[in-house]
Amino acid sequence: LGVLEKLNTMDLEKTPRIIILSAVGQDKITQQAITLGADYYTVKPFDMEVFTKRIREMFNSAPTIQESSAQSNRVSYPTTSSYILTSEPKSKTPVDLETEITNIIHEIGVPAHIKGYMYLREAITMVVNDMELLSAVTKELYPSIAKKYNTTASRVERAIR
């Protein structure tokens, strides 16, 4: 945040694109980083493929902070335990499935820092894509999530509960 504050005091001709990789996922800090001019904010651990995709999107189509400062922020969530906040205007891209799922989980009140959060989000995404998984939660859903996150099905179940 200190670097962002310093950048804001400098009289730069062209504002650099700023991507923040952090271990801190607190809403206040994330929002402050975006307010200070960060283009993207992601919390570790994150999916490198999704992160690379977001960076490419940012440099191919995203406006600068100054161009979009009057418009509201869009939150985009990859399928890992991280999330990326961007200052892109909402009208540029439609709300995707990941964002919708994360918003609903947040509304319910599940805190993002708990281990079960990422498992729950992954489970919902998988069920949306294949409703048959609902009839085999302990036999197929939990084991497939466990495999993806290199853990056991019982740990996935316990963390979600």
From Swiss-Prot:
Entry keywords, A to Z: Activator, Calcium, Cytoplasm, DNA-binding, Phosphoprotein, Repressor, Sporulation, Transcription, Transcription regulation, Two-component regulatory system
Domain (Response regulatory): residue spans on this chain: 1-59
Xref: SUPFAM superfamilies: C-terminal effector domain of the bipartite response regulators, CheY-like
A Gene Ontology cellular-component term: cytoplasm
Record-linked PROSITE patterns: RESPONSE_REGULATORY
GO biological process entries: detection of stimulus; phosphorelay signal transduction system; regulation of sporulation resulting in formation of a cellular spore; sporulation resulting in formation of a cellular spore
Parts of the chain that traverse the membrane: none
Coiled-coil annotated spans: none
Cofactor remark: Binds 1 Ca(2+) ion per subunit.
A GO molecular-function descriptor: DNA binding
Main location: cytoplasm
Pfam family, one: Spo0A_C
DNA-binding region: 143-161
Cofactors: Ca(2+)
Location of the protein in the cell: Cytoplasm
Primary role: May play the central regulatory role in sporulation. It may be an element of the effector pathway responsible for the activation of sporulation genes in response to nutritional stress. Spo0A may act in concert with spo0H (a sigma factor) to control the expression of some genes that are critical to the sporulation process.
NCBIfam families: spore_0_A
Name this protein carries in UniProt: Stage 0 sporulation protein A homolog
Gene expressing this chain: spo0A
